Amino acid sequence: MDFYSVKSQPFVRSPLVDQNPSIQNINEEVKRDIQNPLSYKTETSDKELCQTAACATSCSDWYPQQQTHMPHQNAFDSAKATAKMALPPTAFSNYCVKPSLTRNKDIPRTSIRVSKLRYWQRDYRLAFPNFIFYFDNVDEEIKRRVTQKINNLGAKVATLFTFEVTHFITTRTTDPEMCQPNDVLYLSKTANMKIWLLDKLLNRILFTLLNSDSLVNTSASCLQSLLDGEKVYGTSDKDFYVPSKNVEYFREYFLCIRDLSQYYKPIAVREWEKTLDSGEILWPSLAITAQGRCPFNTGRRRELKITKHNHPAHEIRKQLLSCTNQTNQNNVVKNSASVLVRQIMGDYNITESAVDGAKQMPTEFPKPENLLPVEKRAAMSPLNLLEPRLINKQNTLANQSPRQPPNAFDADPLAHKKVKIETKSGYCENCCERYKDLERHLGGKHHRRFAEKDENFQGLDDLFLLIRRPIRTN
């Protein structure tokens, strides 16, 4: 039950008020108001009661947020504030509203990080001369170099393991609790020594302590690295997929073997074009094969070898029939004329005379006067007066004429198939462009224009002069 809602209930005073000696330094009137705040009738100002500059609104946990209006409320609030300053803190003070910490957005995060590193460097430099290091399972050459750096910072390196060692440096990743009791790693764990890996000492402690200049020009180093990156990869605001002059993008299936350390240029680069017309795959593709077989061999060579000289029979038959029909059409005209001549002339053959004079002396015959024109004589010739029976016989003989051998044709049509020669593609560092055919690129105008200028190879000429074999003096 809230004591503010019941006026007849007296105010319960804390017994710590009487026991607190600081309450004796307050004026008698203020002390009376604190001990019994409901007994006064005269209004007292805040200036007389609260001389410690305490704010009454910060003590909202003393009373509920919603309360009825009471007389002399200002004096009562001031009395409560003074009493709270006199009393020790209680558990209710945790509910007070605390001011929130707002981050200053104007301070960049990089400056905060640099300032923290500077404090860390200062503290470690002051404490470093008190350190004693001991190296376990570390190479002697590395130990010698690290010892020199540690001595420059003022610390010491112990050659023998003692309990005066503060930092135990090792390369072993074994848990110290799993080691033998006589192992130095187990002893260092029991002695509460700092156990560091060698990588932590080199890359985190010594590197940060010795390279203090890297924190000074942080913005300058970032700007320089940004400029170097723009020279190689272009500006950062540019789209990466937009073609660049200094970068060659792969557009088809490619094979690129790079150096893992990125010290050397790519060892092998090959790109294959997509063939949309034919379904032939030019790039290497893995196939499911038996154990011990090459996964890149799909058996296409074996199929071509079998079908090279064993073509289907119906294709050869079509070729033979086409050649035979063309030959028969040419022979029909010749045979029909010869058959008609034999039927008319009988068994008579015209032969050349063996007399010499017959060849030299021309024979003249008198021309008849009633000679008809050629057109009329052709119409009255026996060829046009043949009976239908003779014409049918001629057609039968023409069809029964013996076949002649067809014209010669290639036994293997695939023997003259064009063989595709693979061109050698690559990248020309002189022209700064990528080529698909090396021979065509070397004969091009762009490459020859660069190769014909001697000033482009001035660096090589100077290098050859330096490495030239000296002439013998004798």
Curated annotation (Swiss-Prot):
PROSITE patterns: ZF_DBF4. GO terms for cellular component: cytosol; nucleoplasm; nucleus. Zn(2+) binds at C428, C431, H441, H447. It comes from the Eukaryota. Pfam families: DBF4_BRCT, Dfp1_Him1_M, zf-DBF. SUPFAM superfamilies: BRCT domain. GO terms for biological process: ascospore formation; meiosis II; signal transduction. SMART domains: ZnF_DBF. Keywords: Meiosis, Metal-binding, Nucleus, Sporulation, Zinc, Zinc-finger. GO terms for molecular function: nucleic acid binding; protein serine/threonine kinase activator activity; zinc ion binding. A zinc finger (DBF4-type) spans 421-470. It is found in: Nucleus. May act as a kinase regulator. Essential for progression of meiosis II and sporulation. This is Sporulation-specific protein 6. It comes from Schizosaccharomyces pombe (strain 972 / ATCC 24843) (Fission yeast). The lineage of its organism: Eukaryota, Fungi, Dikarya, Ascomycota, Taphrinomycotina. The gene is spo6.
